[in-house]
């Protein structure tokens, strides 16, 4: 009799676990039913993440999508600590400097801005009144603040926030000299943490990631060809120096940073109020009181 009760208890616990797994509310937009989506927006307090990657060459040893893969890994783990809805894969950003490399997908400036605007508009129409663009691509660091600034051009009933980067972590192993901007030690370490099966460490030295220094200009002078002039192989640094341990430290720091950002944004009640105030005053600038 006792054995029978034990069997019943085990079956009950297993069944309960299966039901619990089935009823756990996903954070991924594309995995939610229409009914569950309504619940998810309420649980997220209208806060939704738009992880922003890119499709480009990453040295001779990594795939084309680390920026997208890593930022989605980070956001998917961050929302386990602070719930928010995650928009599906998005990679329609700025990558003109890599158009000469196989596999790069570079959309026109007009499409980049228009598609991003329509995407955030549609997110807001579906209840995302706080849209958090989590940037995973260095080439977007001018595009995204500019896009956020353009939200002041006309009224919106939602706020766009842009989050990128994380606090520096302690270096694991010896310090390496030279720039480490793209597909080098840092980014390769992150991939060894998030998607190690996609990294070919034996190929990391097949090309040079050294700065070629082909244009001599003052630091405060900018030209669009600067990246190609310095890193024509679209590789900056030394991927062979990467370690999973460094990746674990960096990725965890990134996750923690995104968690803090989500919490701060959920608590932010002022940005939308001030945005609406600004819209109103901008219609009557001569009435603005000093």
Listing of model-derived features with the role each one plays in the protein:
Residues 21-110, 114-130, 138-290:
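Extended, histidine- and acidic-residue-enriched regions that form the cofactor-binding/catalytic faces
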Residues 7-16:
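Bacterial N-terminal signal peptides
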Residues 1, 16-21:
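Short, low-complexity disordered leader/linker segments with a strong preference
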Residues 1-7:
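Bacterial N-terminal signal peptides that target proteins for export
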